[in-house]
Structures are given as C-alpha cells and as structure tokens.
Amino acid sequence: MNRTFAYVSAPNGESHAHAKLRNYCRQLYDLGYLPICPTLMFSRFLDGELPEERENGRAMSMDILRRCRVLVVCSNDVTEDMEKEILLAKRLGIVATTLAGIRKISLQAEPREE
C-alpha cells in the first residue's frame, strides 16, 4: 500500500476539537491518503503553554510538512500558524486544498461506469 502523505493543517486548540480532527483524518484515510496531523500527534507529549515546547512543535510541524505531497486545511478559521504552513506549501509546490477539495479530486479520479 503506497499512500500519499496528507498534512492536516488545523488550529492548535482545545481537546474537544480533537474528535473533529480524528474525523478529518479518518476521511482522508478512507480516500486513500496517509493523514499526518501534528496537532493530534504533538498534543500527546508537548505542552503548548510552554513557549519553548510550542516553538519546537511549530518547527517539527514544518519539517513534517516538507515531506508531504498535500496540505489539507481543516478549518474555516485560518490561524497565523496555519497561514505559515500554507505559505510554505505554496513555496515548495505542495498542493494545498480543503477536505472538500480532496473529496472532489478523489471522486473525479474514480473510474466511471459506462
């Protein structure tokens, strides 16, 4: 199985948003992508309230993004950190889209019955 890495760009926030992010990741997985969500991963071991750990999380997120082929924006509200991710993706030629955009692309790629 060879899946395209899809970076999930989402606001760092409250833990109640994590259920929504898990749902986004599941949908990407179901569409054939390998979802990578630093917000979910790093919240398990980094304390976003500590400036050094927050900055390390940002740096690690950007490093992960550089290895991905697609950036998926999973929020209507784009934070400053998300904007930086989108700009880096653009600079590196990484496709940036939304979950709806990924769904549309995936549906168009499916073979059509005649």
Question: Can you name each region flagged by the protein language model?
Answer:
Residues 1-114:
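Conserved catalytic or regulatory cores that recognize and/or transform ribose-phosphate-containing ligands
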